[in-house]
Amino acid sequence: MFLVVGLGNPGIEYQFTPHNAGFLAVDAIAAEHNAVVSNRRCQALTGKIQLGGREVILAKPETYMNLSGVAVSALVRELNADPVRDLLVLYDELDLPIGSIRVRERGSPASHNGARSICSALGTADWPRVRIGVGPSGEDDLFRKGKNYLLTPMRKADLATLDGALERTARAVETVVTRGIGVAMNEFNRRENNGPAA
């Protein structure tokens, strides 16, 4: 069993905001496998797929971003999952250009409140993640950065750019589950495989 959690905020008003990139990634993976993420479990919506013969639980916490750790830690306990080996978290990263992704084996949550909540709830930052770039593009970068930007619906052009990152995120998830985090880092953190240049 493997647990893949996408972070975001529930509610239609947040659906296509940069902060919901993790939810969008889980939805894209589920759609690709004709799965639905709708079962309520541990304060999250969940669904199941198979990757490389391994059962994968897809999850979207319903706790809102800042309390993501409540749902993630409950799922980890219920599924008897090891956060280092059996967990992968997908979330937005304001400091990466939109359309790019970074696969990390562990690390600081930096300023991401959802990642901070997970670190606090699990008692460790040693859990794999895919950070999905949502950094604003264009001349209004400085004006658009921050909380208001993260919670504002994306422009069509930015959504189109993000689609490429969601597709690469789905491939990265499959690689982590079937071949390991090290292989995924080598493959998806190379600039030529990672969307727009930083």
Swiss-Prot record:
<dbReference type="GO" id="GO:0000049">
    <property type="term" value="F:tRNA binding"/>
</dbReference>
<keyword id="KW-0820">tRNA-binding</keyword>
<feature type="binding site">
    <location>
        <position position="64"/>
    </location>
    <ligand>
        <name>tRNA</name>
    </ligand>
</feature>
<keyword id="KW-0694">RNA-binding</keyword>
<feature type="site" description="Stabilizes the basic form of H active site to accept a proton">
    <location>
        <position position="92"/>
    </location>
</feature>
<comment type="similarity">
    <text>Belongs to the PTH family.</text>
</comment>
<protein>
    <recommendedName>
        <fullName>Peptidyl-tRNA hydrolase</fullName>
        <ecNumber>3.1.1.29</ecNumber>
    </recommendedName>
</protein>
<feature type="active site" description="Proton acceptor">
    <location>
        <position position="19"/>
    </location>
</feature>
<comment type="function">
    <text>Hydrolyzes ribosome-free peptidyl-tRNAs (with 1 or more amino acids incorporated), which drop off the ribosome during protein synthesis, or as a result of ribosome stalling.</text>
</comment>
<dbReference type="GO" id="GO:0072344">
    <property type="term" value="P:rescue of stalled ribosome"/>
</dbReference>
<dbReference type="Pfam" id="PF01195">
    <property type="entry name" value="Pept_tRNA_hydro"/>
</dbReference>
<dbReference type="GO" id="GO:0006515">
    <property type="term" value="P:protein quality control for misfolded or incompletely synthesized proteins"/>
</dbReference>
<feature type="binding site">
    <location>
        <position position="113"/>
    </location>
    <ligand>
        <name>tRNA</name>
    </ligand>
</feature>
<dbReference type="GO" id="GO:0004045">
    <property type="term" value="F:peptidyl-tRNA hydrolase activity"/>
</dbReference>
<keyword id="KW-0963">Cytoplasm</keyword>
<dbReference type="InterPro" id="IPR001328">
    <property type="entry name" value="Pept_tRNA_hydro"/>
</dbReference>
<comment type="function">
    <text>Catalyzes the release of premature peptidyl moieties from peptidyl-tRNA molecules trapped in stalled 50S ribosomal subunits, and thus maintains levels of free tRNAs and 50S ribosomes.</text>
</comment>
<feature type="binding site">
    <location>
        <position position="14"/>
    </location>
    <ligand>
        <name>tRNA</name>
    </ligand>
</feature>
<keyword id="KW-0378">Hydrolase</keyword>
<feature type="binding site">
    <location>
        <position position="66"/>
    </location>
    <ligand>
        <name>tRNA</name>
    </ligand>
</feature>
<dbReference type="GO" id="GO:0005737">
    <property type="term" value="C:cytoplasm"/>
</dbReference>
<dbReference type="InterPro" id="IPR036416">
    <property type="entry name" value="Pept_tRNA_hydro_sf"/>
</dbReference>
<feature type="site" description="Discriminates between blocked and unblocked aminoacyl-tRNA">
    <location>
        <position position="9"/>
    </location>
</feature>
<comment type="subunit">
    <text>Monomer.</text>
</comment>
